[in-house]
Structures are given as C-alpha cells and as structure tokens.
Design a protein with these regions (language model features):
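Helix-centered, glycine/charged polyanion-binding patches within enzymatic domains
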Residues: 2-14, 18, 204-281, 290
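Polybasic low-complexity intrinsically disordered regions
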Residues: 51-67, 75-81, 85, 89, ...
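Basic, amphipathic alpha-helical segments enriched in Lys/Arg and hydrophobic/aromatic residues
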Residues: 60-75, 259-323
Length: 323
C-alpha cells in the first residue's frame, strides 16, 4: 500500500495576500465602533413591550431591549452591572426617556431571551465549511498555568460548532459540552440551513459514512464532499452514493500526496471557518461569562450574530501576491 506524502508547507512558500478594497474595509472597521449600529432605532422604538392583556405584572423590557443589552455586554466584554451602567449612560446621552434593564433582570432574562436564527437568504446552493473550537468557562488563564504550574484539571470548556458559507458568514452554530463529538452535531447544523449545499468541507473528524449520507441528503444531486480521510483509512467494501467520493479522495492522496490533493479539491477553503474562530476570539474573547448552559448557548449565539453584523458593515477583499 502506498504511503501518504507529507502535507507540510514551509512558511516562506505560503501564499501571501493583500487587501484590495482597503477604503471600504476601513470604513467598515470604523463602523464597528459606532454605538448607534448596536443600539438601533428599531430597538429604541420597541424598548417597552405592549401590554399582553393578561392579569398580573407586565414585562418592562421587550425581547429586543434585552437582546440589545446582552449584545453590548458581549461586544465590549462587560460584567452585567457595568452593562447596566453603560447602557443607561448611552440612553441619557441620546436624550431618551428610557431606562436600561438592571443587572438582575439581564441575568434572569438571559435564560429565556429569544435570539434570532443565523439563517441568511441565498440565491442558490451554498458552499458550507464546518468545524469546532473550545470556549473556556472555568479555570485560570494560560499564563497562570504556565508560570505557577497550576493544575489543568480544574478547567472546563464548551465546544462551539459553526458552519460558514463561501463569504465567511456564520450560517449555523451550536454549543455543546467539551466532550461533544463534532460529527454528531452535524444534523443540528444542517437543520439550520435552508439553502441546498453544493460543496461541503470539513476536517478529518467528520470522516464517517454517516456524514457523507447526511450531506448527500441535504445537498444538491452533484454535491461535492471534501473531507480528508484518516491516515489509517482503507478502501471501503461499498462505494455507492456520496461515499464513493471518499474512495476517490483516498486514491488521489495516495497518488499525489495530501498537499496536492488539498490544492486540487479546494480543501484549503477550510481556512474560512478557522478565520471565523480567530475573529470570534479576537473580538469577543476565548471564554463565556454566563454560568448556566442555557445562558452560555445564548451568549455564543449572540456572539455569532455580532460577527455577522460586522461582516455586513465591511469585509476585506484580498488577492494573492505573486512574488
């Protein structure tokens, strides 16, 4: 049996990129800091919910008001009390006779607030790239662990699974326990996507026949599935349907090596989802502030919506630099 060829690339041979639309991108970067983008007129108009007609106490803040406050909290990485003070000062500066939700209300409503889905309208089939990353919820930072040799046992994480389209927008997301299996969450991600899938890209953690079958059912008739087979992979007995693409990839890798296969198959587009994780942790941090699993899920979904909104304001268009 042929051996697998190395896929490592020396850094000096990697393709370099430059931003083409720098003026538009710079305008979008400035827009991300515009507070009025996040405290919209729509939210202000619907700040106080209408009377529901039922007996008893009425809610003082609408779902959109709570969602706006929690968005500002995530965006500026604020504790709940500072979120209350920050939003209250914004409303005063804008000359609005509105009050910010207090921190106890935010904590309670964070358990029930409705976060809109990440669904985007697409004109046709999409290319989907999926992966997962860890978000810390308990434990010391990396520096304390390194300097003071602190135990890594008292640390806990949640796993954020996302799917991005060819433009880099997050179109599906789910938060699971750190022990959550990547492949088992795929059905939930696919259920969030309305458009058919023409190309599916994922890493070796998704190298299962069930994944090929699920993507085949959710995709177009000629859907292309790009998943690198495991190094221990062998030719399957049956290669019917989408599973046949795995056998073709396996044979091609044995022939030309993994690096060349990645170039030919478009697997390098997997970097889009990695870039999404980099953006999430750079903008929102690598952890979750909420303590309950329900609130943590809402916090992560709000974070994904923030990244999509930033992308709408402006994203870079780059081109390869030929040296």
């Amino acid at each position: 049996m042929a051996t697998w060829k190395s896929s490592r690339v020396n850094r000096k041979y990697k393709t370099k990129y430059r931003i083409r639309s720098w003026r538009e991108y710079e305008r979008g970067l400035r827009g991300r800091g515009d507070v009025t983008i996040w405290l919209s007129q729509e939210a202000i108009a619907a700040w106080i919910p209408p009377n529901n007609g039922l007996r008893g106490g009425q809610r003082r803040y609408s779902n959109l008001a709570i969602l706006t406050a929690l968005t500002l909290r995530a965006l500026f990485r604020l504790p709940l009390r500072q979120t209350e003070g920050f939003l209250d000062s914004l409303l005063r500066l804008m000359g609005l006779a509105l009050k910010a939700p207090d921190h106890t209300t935010l904590s309670r409503r964070n358990q029930t607030v409705e976060v809109p889905s990440l669904t985007r309208v697409h004109d046709g089939p999409i290319s989907l790239v999926v992966d997962s990353t860890g978000l810390k919820i308990l434990g010391s930072g990396e520096w304390n662990v390194h300097k003071y040799k602190m135990s890594r046992k008292r640390r806990d994480w949640r796993k954020l699974h996302i799917g991005v389209d060819e433009e880099g927008f997050i179109v599906a997301a789910r938060l699971t326990a750190s022990s959550g299996d990547d492949a088992s969450t795929l059905p939930d991600l696919l259920d969030q996507i309305e458009a058919p899938i023409r190309r599916f890209i994922a890493d070796g953690a998704y190298d299962r026949r069930s994944i090929y079958d699920q993507v085949g059912a959710a995709g177009t008739e000629d859907v292309v599935i790009v998943i690198p087979p495991r190094r221990s992979a062998v030719s399957p007995r049956s290669t019917n349907g989408p599973w046949a693409q795995r056998e073709a990839a396996l044979q091609r890798i044995h022939k030309v090596g993994q690096r060349e296969w990645q170039n030919e198959s478009g697997y390098r587009q997997q970097a889009r989802v990695e870039n999404g994780f980099f953006r999430y942790k750079s903008v929102l941090g690598g952890g979750l502030k909420a303590r309950s699993s329900i609130a943590q899920t809402r916090e992560a979904m709000i974070g994904c919506r923030i990244l999509n909104r930033m992308f709408e304001l402006g994203r870079p268009e780059s081109y390869a630099v030929v040296s």
